[in-house]
Design a protein with these regions (language model features):
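A solvent-exposed interaction/effector surface
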Residues: 1-165
Length: 165
């Protein structure tokens, strides 16, 4: 039996990112997400900059004007230095700070990553914690056997719990 915990959950954690380059990924671009990631790296190099740390994936669900659920996905990387004069489709934020998050450290095969999100949602449900409905996934380390990822889910500042989408 494996005694290593696959998903460790902690409450009241803070996600802090500095010099963040952000690229929103549209629904029809999802199949090209690896290409988009490569293009981000190329863009950073053409600006004479370099990344610090791993890729971060932001996701949330929003309703559109027709009442349809739209999934929002953004790729983010931290940079060594700020970039000025950002070109579309990129945006830059000097700092992103998300306080009071539910946190999960996932250490398992990449195809099982969805269980980290599920475990955090179940933990929130069992402890009457209201989640905002978005998540930040920091891809800490990856090899052939396993992925280590940190998942941050922002708590809702009041209001009702997010219903299943």
């Amino acid at each position: 039996m494996n005694t290593t915990e696959k998903i460790i959950v902690k409450e009241n954690k803070t996600l802090k990112l500095n010099n963040v380059l952000i690229r929103e990924v549209s629904q029809n671009e999802l199949v090209d997400i690896n290409k988009i990631s490569y293009m981000m790296d190329s863009y950073i190099k053409t600006k004479g900059n370099a990344t610090v740390g791993p890729m971060i994936n932001y996701s949330s669900a929003e309703g559109d004007e027709n009442g349809q659920v739209k999934i929002v996905i953004k790729l983010m990387v931290q940079l060594k230095n700020p970039i000025h004069n950002i070109d579309k489709p990129y945006e830059f934020k000097s700092q992103i700070r998300i306080t009071n998050c539910l946190f999960g450290r996932f250490s398992e095969k990449e195809e099982n990553l969805q269980f980290a999100y599920s475990k955090l949602q179940v933990h929130a449900f069992e402890n009457d914690i209201k989640l905002k409905g978005d998540s930040y996934t920091v891809f800490v380390n990856k090899n052939e056997e396993k992925l280590v990822a940190d998942v941050f889910m922002e708590l809702d500042k009041g209001g009702t719990a997010i219903e299943g989408l």
